[in-house]
Design a protein with these regions (language model features):
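Acidic ATP/Mg2+-coordinating residue in the GHKL
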Residues: 225
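Conserved glycine-rich
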Residues: 269-270
Length: 289
């Protein structure tokens, strides 16, 4: 009877070993026998948990690999367009022979256009480097008390000329003492991106309003515009990288909203996008305490 028990346990160990080999060689389907008691049952349970964990890690790595491949394709596309245009401009400048007034004027115009394209590529590289820092965790976000009113005013400064040109008025409503804990510089970049998005979707001008409040649980910032709103088709994609809505007027990169979401996510916050009943878009930011 003792010998029979030894043979049974050896057979179970051999079966478990065979299953582990199949797993190691990458078989998709595997079946670990159930052992009711003893060391083999404990070992079998640990192997099962290890396999599940390794499969989950492999799936996550594959998702990250696919994401990186998509990112590289998007970046290549974003760079290819201005570089192709610059190549064509260089070719056309070479064909402009002579030193007449008309030739000089055309060369100056095309050189100006090339400079604009170079600036665009430079801006894209800067934004991508910031996104890379956020993704890799190397971006150092400070945690300090931020006045929400000061943050909004600072965030709107770079957009003052654009708002004037497009007839957009900034409306503020909130308590001067309301605040949250976060990084002022990164938070300002996120808010600027959301405000810029609103301006780009307001073809006929209007009010770009920011309201805020602080509760015992979170601080809230609400940004609304009087633009065309977000279509049902676009709403699920609004925070995706390189996604540009059909109603945007300017040729941006489609990274601003994704960056804004990433910045606040790093600060224990969330951003939600929705449409207003009276028209236009609404972005609600919550930063938890």
């Amino acid at each position: 009877m003792f010998a029979s028990e030894i043979c049974r346990r050896e057979a179970q160990a051999s079966s478990l070993s065979d299953e582990i080999d199949r797993i190691l060689y990458g078989e998709e389907h595997w079946n670990l026998d159930e052992y009711s008691e003893g060391e083999l049952a404990i070992l079998q349970d640990k192997v099962r948990k290890l396999v599940i964990r390794l499969r989950e890690q492999a799936d996550q790595l594959q998702k990250e690999k696919n994401f990186q491949a998509e990112m590289m394709a998007d970046i290549s596309h974003q760079l290819k367009t201005p570089l192709t245009a610059m190549r064509l401009m260089i070719s056309s400048i070479r064909k402009l022979e002579g030193s007449g007034e008309d030739e000089v004027r055309q060369r100056a115009r095309r050189l100006t256009e090339m400079q604009q394209l170079v600036d665009r590529v430079d801006s894209l590289v800067v934004v991508l480097l910031k996104m890379a820092k956020l993704d890799s965790g190397t971006a150092i976000l400070q945690k300090e008390k931020i006045s929400i009113k000061d943050l909004i005013l600072h965030s709107a400064e770079p957009l003052a000329i654009s708002m004037d040109l497009h007839g957009v008025k900034l409306c503020l409503n909130g308590n001067d003492t309301d605040s949250f804990q976060g990084d002022f510089g990164w938070s300002a970049e996120a808010i600027t991106n959301i405000l810029k998005n609103g301006i780009e979707h307001m073809e006929n001008g209007g009010n770009l309003c920011v309201s805020w409040r602080e509760t015992s649980v979170y601080s809230e910032i609400v940004i609304t515009d009087e633009g065309s709103g977000i279509s049902d088709e676009e709403l699920p994609h609004i925070f995706e990288r390189f996604y540009r809505g059909k109603t945007a007027r300017h040729s941006g990169f489609g990274i601003g909203m994704a960056m804004a979401q990433s910045i606040f996510a790093k600060q224990n916050g969330t951003i939600k996008a929705q449409n207003r009943e009276e028209g236009g878009a609404k972005f609600v930011i919550h930063v938890r305490k």
